[in-house]
Amino acid sequence: MLAGVQLSDGLKLEAIADGGFSYAEIPYEIIEKDELPTYKKKDGDSRVLKVSGFSYPLAKLTPDKMYELLENCRRYQGNYIVLDTMNCEAGILENVVEECSMMMTDYRIPVFIENGCNGSDETGYLNNAYSDISSLKSIAEYCNRLCDTAIVGISINVGYSNLLAKNVRSQIDQCSEYLCMIHANDNGGVYNEKQMPFTFTRGRGNLITDWYHIIGALIKIEFSGWMIFDNSGTFARVPEELQTQYVRMLHAIVKEWQGQFTFVERVLNKPDKKLILFGAGQMLWDYMDVLGNKFPPYFAVDNGKMRWGTKVCGVDVKAPSAILDVPAQERNVVICCM
């Protein structure tokens, strides 16, 4: 998983680099206004901040603009172009690709089409032609047929999904073969606030956005694309002297999420041992949904006597003492904490 932060008004490139990231996503309007801003390195600093790619509103896309985007993406060594579909009519990308397919194939720069909706914070938000994953898949399939290669992929904007009360886990499952990017931003489901992940809770700390299950869904499909934090709402209000600390928090979130990806290889991938999971509640159900086929447990144990002798997704649930029935050198006991 490759991670970066989207540049936004008020956020400085120095903060992104000092915060630990190697990639910055650039809204193309910055390039249109002026050259890409540079950042100052400290003495002895070996960091390199690279352009992950450009973001651009699909509503403004034309064949000439597509050429300009591809040319500048190559110039700045970007890796993709992601198209924002908020308040956008249907058919725009298809029409552009019909005219530009050969050029896009020659450049070989991936183009990601993102989920979106119509509306504003004042009027509320409704579905548009790009709200459903099935529509995005149809667009990607059509464009890739025109290009005769896989050029167009899908980006899921978590915040936009929240505005329409979409199930992000289900969206990830639906487009797994096309999913190339996640735009990670948070809101309360009403306003397009673009805050940092984990910002919004309900009641006594219940997350409005189910980030852990979103990451679980990405692990399930073995996601290896881009995770870009587009948190312009946060950085519009953070004092400049605190920007680096906030970016470091984002970097810590990435490390924690990446740790969940590597957890599989570090802890579960021990084929010479019997996997025993400790805990047979909801987290065991979640484990079986995400990893059960790849790393099936030998059995599970639980402190709750009511669960002993039951099965969860075909896995026997036993008393903790059953662990001792398996020789120590043959067992791999893992606390189930999906």
Regions of interest found by a model, annotated:
Residues 14, 34-45, 68-74, 95-103, ...:
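Short amphipathic alpha-helices and their capping/turn segments at secondary-structure boundaries
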Residues 1-79, 109, 148-151, 255:
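N-terminal pre-domain/capping segments
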Residues 7-13, 26-38, 57-65, 86-93, ...:
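Acidic-and-aromatic substrate-binding clefts and catalytic sites of carbohydrate-active enzymes
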Residues 25, 81-82, 112, 155, ...:
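Conserved beta-strand positions in the central sheet of alpha/beta enzyme cores
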Residues 241-338:
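Hydrophobic, well-ordered beta-alpha structural blocks that scaffold small-molecule cofactor pockets
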Residues 21, 179, 224, 295-297:
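Core-facing hydrophobic residues within beta-strands of well-ordered domains
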Residues 58-153, 163, 248, 254-261:
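Active-site acidic/histidine proton-transfer and metal-coordination neighborhood
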Residues 63, 122-133, 160-224, 313-319:
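Gly/Pro-rich active-site loop or hairpin
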